[in-house]
Amino acid sequence: MEFPFGSVGTTNFRRFTPESLAEIEKQIAAHRAAKKGRPKQRGQKDKSEKPRPQLDLKACNQLPRFYGELPAELVGEPLEDLDPFYSTHRTFIVLDKSRTISRFSATWALWLFSPFNLIRRTAIKVSVHSWFSIFITVTILVNCVCMTRTDLPEKLEYAFTVVYTFEALIKILARGFCLNEFTYLRDPWNWLDFSVITLAYVGAAIDLRGISGLRTFRVLRALKTVSVIPGLKVIVGALIHSVRKLADVTILTVFCLSVFALVGLQLFKGNLKNKCIKNGTDPHKADNLSSEMAGDIFIKPGTTDPLLCGNGSDAGHCPNDYVCRKTSDNPDFNYTSFDSFAWAFLSLFRLMTQDSWERLYQQTLRASGKMYMVFFVLVIFLGSFYLVNLILAVVTMAYEEQSQATIAEIEAKEKKFKEALEVLQKEQEVLAALGIDTTSLYSHNGSPLAPKNANERRPRVKSRMSEGSTDDNRSLQSDPYNQRRMSFLGLSSGRRRASHSSVFHFRAPSQDVSFPDGILDDGVFHGDQESRRSSILLGRGAGQAGPLPRSPLPQSPNPGPRRGEEGQRGVPTGELATGAPEGPALDAAGQKNFLSADYLNEPFRAQRAMSVVSIMTSVIEELEESKLKCPPCLISLAQKYLIWECCPKWKKFKMVLFELVTDPFAELTITLCIVVNTVFMAMEHYPMTDAFDAMLQAGNIVFTVFFTMEMAFKIIAFDPYYYFQKKWNIFDCVIVTVSLLELSTSKKGSLSVLRTFRLLRVFKLAKSWPTLNMLIKIIGNSVGALGNLTFILAIIVFIFALVGKQLLSENYGCRRDGISVWNGERLRWHMCDFFHSFLVVFRILCGEWIENMWVCMEVSQDYICLTLFLTVMVLGNLVVLNLFIALLLNSFSADNLTAPEDDGEVNNLQVALARIQVFGHRASRAITSYIRSHCRLRWPKVETQLGMKPPLTSCKAENHIATDAVNAAVGNLAKPALGGPKENHGDFITDPNVWVSVPIAEGESDLDELEEDVEHASQSSWQEESPKGQQELLQQVQKCEDHQAARSPPSGMSSEDLAPYLGERWQREESPRVPAEGVDDTSSSEGSTVDCPDPEEILRKIPELAEELDEPDDCFPEGCTRRCPCCKVNTSKFPWATGWQVRKTCYRIVEHSWFESFIIFMILLSSGALAFEDNYLEEKPRVKSVLEYTDRVFTFIFVFEMLLKWVAYGFKKYFTNAWCWLDFLIVNISLTSLIAKILEYSDVASIKALRTLRALRPLRALSRFEGMRVVVDALVGAIPSIMNVLLVCLIFWLIFSIMGVNLFAGKFSRCVDTRSNPFSVVNSTFVTNKSDCYNQNNTGHFFWVNVKVNFDNVAMGYLALLQVATFKGWMDIMYAAVDSRDINSQPNWEESLYMYLYFVVFIIFGGFFTLNLFVGVIIDNFNQQKKKLGGQDIFMTEEQKKYYNAMKKLGSKKPQKPIPRPLNKYQGFVFDIVTRQAFDIIIMALICLNMITMMVETDNQSEEKTKVLGRINQFFVAVFTGECVMKMFALRQYYFTNGWNVFDFIVVILSISSLLFSAILSSLESYFSPTLLRVIRLARIGRILRLIRAAKGIRTLLFALMMSLPALFNIGLLLFLVMFIYSIFGMASFANVIDEAGIDDMFNFKTFGNSMLCLFQITTSAGWDGLLSPILNTGPPYCDPNRPNSNGSKGNCGSPAVGILFFTTYIIISFLIVVNMYIAVILENFNVATEESTEPLSEDDFDMFYETWEKFDPEATQFIAFSALSDFADTLSGPLRIPKPNQNILIQMDLPLVPGDKIHCLDILFAFTKNVLGESGELDSLKTNMEEKFMATNLSKASYEPIATTLRCKQEDISATIIQKAYRNYMLQRSLMLSNPLHVPRAEEDGVSLPREGYVTFMANDNGGLPDKSETASATSFPPSYDSVTRGLSDRANISTSSSMQNEDEVTAKEGKSPGPQ
């Protein structure tokens, strides 16, 4: 048996010597000779794969253990390369102490140093030494820290340069400079080092003080950290990979932004200069007015910005005494405008990244008009959502590809390891057969490969054995580490693996939840060492382990660490396989491969086997040791002092405590205490009474004492040695210690910092809350996987912060105290010092870059700021943050959120709750029976209540007993027939010997842990069964009846009634879905009871019976008729028969489609009527009265509809439908408000509130519109997981909120001066605190106010955090926090500067992680639902799916007749021109030129420029018109058969009309709005869209968008509905709010239109803080509660509670749900589109095939001659092309020929497709599929039966040639014989006339010329002599044709291309 990894032992490592080099040279020479010897055959694909380097022997990887132990003397020495790939390369390897591989070139370095030179060897040794890289890394880090300081001496710089130079020299000496592979400059990372050093010397030589640009290059040194740390290189690789992939998206983004920017330029140029100017201002002066000259310009109240306005009817208007005029500058320092293409592009980029876009939106709408909202809707939905998410999709895909590669690498390693294990296993068996004790391997220290600490290990093993603990938790199966190890070794593991814990997931396998501490002490287990070893070696999974030892408590007095916490209560944790062999019996495979004992008779082999086993043992131990955290000496010390075994009484005391702390009720109590403690902490607020404060303090002390006691008890019960091996316990211990510290410290000072630690206790809930646990794990895993990425992000932030500081710090006017003052104003965001620079960069990463950039551009040069900010934005925000999201999404997997982790642990909390419930039910039963026996009441029997099943008709949904442990326990108490004795039932949860049974579907049973039932208590598993035919259906129904026969009298239909109707066609009908859950006698998990289809459903599917069944159901549910027999009526007798007829009539009315349409129409009308009830309704009495009447009419109609449905459907059916309930509630609201109005109670507050609920009316449309209903159903499916994540987010945020309350409660108040606009904060030198503010208030203008959004209590804290997480309004909160001093003190500028960090940490963990978890959850959930639907899209209706599939297939293709060339010679000439490719290219170039000329346009351009541009435009219109006319002239009626031509035609018509209109309108400018002119000019932009035709990558992305459209339309519809309802609510609640912040005369809730404007803006969560701000006003100085309003109400204050609820719910619904659904759809369709585009053959390739075909087959006969095939194959492009010479490839394709040597189109396409895709099963299905499609769309192919094939013809050809040659040779021999004078001819015998020619002539004829036509089968067709060929083409002789084909191909190549088709 050969060991798979080469020879074993130190022979693997051979020094690199001159002999080794000579051997390599020999190999290289041999390789070259071999290469020359075999010239590559032309026309043949080189199938042989090139050899590749081994993955695990790559440079920078660690050498795997199985290459043996590296002797110390070979560390750092040149060794021969182990990778066979490099046997022909001049290389050698060097290994350092940690076995890391470094590969070097064996050529001379710098032409001076050979590989054996002493200097070079020393350099090599130094360069691979670990201390060298540590020294360099430390130097780089110190250098980075120094760079953040400005006051350090220049000499320090030189020191660093010297170190870097030394490093470079060492590397160059060791590797060589650049010529050969593995030299210094061949590694791109070294380019970075080299450039840094070069620049340092350039800087030293020239004085660089003036050139700050070059100085900033020093910053790149931070990147050197990447090159030093190997893990980072991989991530950078992924980043670069994703940037490459972004090329197409970047092009598409730039293209779309350019188009939108051009539209913006045409529509809005110059508009943002419109401002309100005082009446009477001189017009010439107005033109030069800028915002600085504030005297004449109206300033918007509450801001410092001028009020913009427009002259359109729906634009913003000026106040009285002001008029709207165009001035000289734009808003925001003149940077926000559409005046030129560049500024418009910047504005559009800002819109795409959604930074402060609401400001641009409001400015533009105010200046241009509300109708332009359409432009913003398009840009936000197409530009922002679509493009940004495409970037996410691309990055995600790039990351996944990288991950797949990594996985493949791991799998390759795993495979090798398995092979090694098999070898080891066999050798082990042989050793055992020879009687060698395998445990003696541990003492096999003579071998150089012996495990390092085998002798240390032995005593530990013995000491453990002597402990004699038989704790079942130590068994191999239950230890998570071992499971992981076994799975790594490829063995089966005990517990079923949850689907997401795959070994090869995208992250390192995380530790098992149930055992967070990984392994017990050092990974070697109690019990028999040898059996454990053998079980690993024999590959026997834990499932075969046989029964495990059980004991209620360990025999040893030490209770062990896990006993009682996870594995207690005697529940089996291993999955016990039936019939598993007990003991170390060999499996069959093992016996089969058993090696003979003779094999090891020779001493050498025995020795070798020992050595192999020893190596493999060391590999296994290496795995174990990787888990060893402590050195062995410390472990023995810990075992001695930290396991407390004293006198028996102490042990007894320990036992008692042990029982106490492991009881489920103890766990429940602790959990309750954590919850109550959290509530206590959350109750802190400001202002707080002393008594309340004292109560909280007392509570804190009580809880601290309680948790301290818990910790003490656990330490005593478990012993410290075991207690501290659980991570949760360590966590507990830290928190308790900190709490005690906090109690001991004084009340003031660092109190709040310590307090925050107490909050972490909330995380203990994760032990009993699976979702929280899972999300913490996801964040943990992501942070783990993201460790490197986070580091890269940190480096990026660091570098950009430093660059910013170096380049810009001087421009910000920095003072000594670090405050930046510019134009007399203090700046918060500047780059004066590193901390502020870091904050600016961090803010850009949060997506807020534009405002910082404006300030930067004001203080510095524009280009530096633009470059810096946009680079950070694109690199940091778009790429790195998206990579983060990609990793987060990958951390999710299938059933993470739906099912809690299957970790085999009985959840103590659930056990405790189950016990309580069981006890409660027992108590209630006892009380019931007591009352019954005493009062002698005849109550219905409990048995019937609990056990009775409804009759068969409703069997569909109710025939299952829930898995829920408690329900099962309780529900079965009253069913003695189902289980054992009654008294045992309550205990079945905790007692494995008690089972409860339920009928189980045949063939379904599984053996699983009982824990899963309790674990999945609240889960439901859905199971579908599809009966395979009539028999099964009947059987199922029969079973359903039997199932209930014992319990209920049969009613409804039975299977006998069904039998006659179930014909053949119902055989494959699927039964409806049934929630299948149950507990049975063989399974305590997921057993499914019998699935019963509803017979009525089956019958409804039979058309003949559908009519009869079309009757109303019973009116009342079963329960009513059972309790009140009067409800049960006989419909065949007189009074009820009439009623029955009425019901049937109502039923037919309600079911009629016209009725439904009428109701939908009414719903739409009534919803529309609500939109008119706005703030100005009182001013329109006529409209008001109409609305009142219509409201009554609608209410009556809806009430009538409801009554009709009650009569038709009956109460049971009506009230069991969720949509009907919705209708019922909404109708009741309308009815109540109507009655209140009639009774004149409509002014009562509660009735007013109820009236606002009429806004819910549109919700009724949901159930009627299929598109929306589909989306809502998908959403409802996702609600459980969304709520789960929402809850977990709230817990996360609770911690930050309580922390915020501790840090900032009461500190946000300030003294403001109300005279300024906006209110200014009074200087803290003038007013220091609250009392000062009141004392100084002589003028009455000073107010002591609080910031509206603050941290005074936890609820407000949540609101503040929501604003921070959505980055809206967060600046004000941060400024207040940073300026805060103390409670009731006046804030001071940046007093607590480092409070910024609180927000930074929250944004990373609270904002970034939790909000992206939503994306993850939603996408994940929709994928789940998709799987359930069998991969169909869940957001589309059936109709839309048809569109989607049509888009995907793009119709079945067929050869089209090409447009015939016109006969007229002039037309023919033009036809030749327009069908040339060059013509298309020229037109494309002109379109690009046109685009460029449109970009040149600006606002305020000179008259001359306008004229020139006008002429150029006219020229382009003429050109495109000319093109259009030419094409129409040449192509005639065929012009309009092409969609693009139609598009061109429309664009040309629009362009001409826009020219005419602009001429007309310019003369009538006073009558028309110039806006109309602008819209018409947009037609020109349509021309640009023609460019899309040319770009394939962009087409794919747009194709993805087209495929997304139906689903996006549905989601958009739902979003519109939500906006509609909220805008009605907004009008009812906030119409009278004061104009302030985001609310003004245009953006408000006064009318429906304005409300929609506001709601569209906050759909992306933009500016919601501004809309909320005025609603939070409750009184002076902000608003006046007594001010009368126009609609009769009083006050302009808001209602904070309603406002907060309104905005937070809207943001959660729209932003988190709807927008994320949008993302989910785009990601999905992008994947589909790219899959289709990355397939080897796409639709485009087939199109191209047909286009080429048209040229060769102008008559569309579908056949071409075989002679033309070679040219056809060469003319094709893309993957289908077969370049010349291609004859033999085509012949080998074996194409069928029809008479006339013709080949059919489809046969060629199949053959070429096969040539690209290779042989595969899918090809056959594709072939039949294509054939069917083709037959459907084309004339029948059957008329042409093939008579031969190309291969057959070639074989016949060659056969003929061979026969001819043989005959000639024969004749030649004859002639030679005859010319021989000695030969006597015997002509009469031969009977053949002899040739007269001589020998030479004959030879010339045979070899020189080739007269025989059959030998040149290149361009001419075969001779038409095939009629004689029979059709049996199967008997093809395999004549070797390759040589003749090769000759022929060479001939063909020489002859050149043969002519194509005529």
UniProtKB/Swiss-Prot annotation:
- Give residues where Phosphoserine occurs: S440, S443, S466, S478, S611, S614, S1452
Task: Please report any disulfide bonds recorded for this protein chain, giving both cysteine positions.
Answer: C276-C318, C856-C865
What are the IQ domain coordinates in residue numbering?
A: 1852-1881
- Spans of the I repeats are 116-404
Q: Which residues cross the membrane?
A: 126-149, 155-174, 188-206, 213-232, 249-272, 373-398, 659-683, 695-718, 727-746, 753-772, 789-809, 864-889, 1149-1172, 1186-1211, 1218-1239, 1244-1265, 1285-1312, 1393-1419, 1473-1496, 1508-1531, 1538-1561, 1574-1595, 1611-1633, 1699-1723
This chain is glycosylated at: N279, N288, N311, N334, N1323, N1329, N1337, N1500, N1687
Q: Which domain of life is it from?
A: Eukaryota
Composition bias, kind Basic and acidic residues: at what positions? 43-54, 1947-1958
A GO molecular function for this record? voltage-gated sodium channel activity
Query: In Gene Ontology terms, what is a biological process of this protein?
Result: establishment of localization in cell
Q: What else is known?
A: Mus musculus is sensitive to the pain-inducing components of the bark scorpion (Centruroides sculpturatus) venom while Onychomys torridus is not. Gln-861 may account for the difference between both rodents and its replacement by a glutamate, the corresponding amino acid found in the Onychomys torridus ortholog, allows inhibition of Snc10a by the venom, which in turn, inhibits sodium currents, blocks action potential propagation and may induce analgesia.
Complexes and interactors: The channel consists of an ion conducting pore forming alpha-subunit regulated by one or more associated auxiliary subunits SCN1B, SCN2B and SCN3B; electrophysiological properties may vary depending on the type of the associated beta subunits. Found in a number of complexes with PRX, DYNLT1 and PDZD2. Interacts with proteins such as FSTL1, PRX, DYNLT1, PDZD2, S100A10 and many others. Interacts with NEDD4 and NEDD4L.
Its family remark reads: Belongs to the sodium channel (TC 1.A.1.10) family. Nav1.8/SCN10A subfamily.
Q: Protein name, please?
A: Sodium channel protein type 10 subunit alpha
What organism is the protein native to? Mus musculus (Mouse)
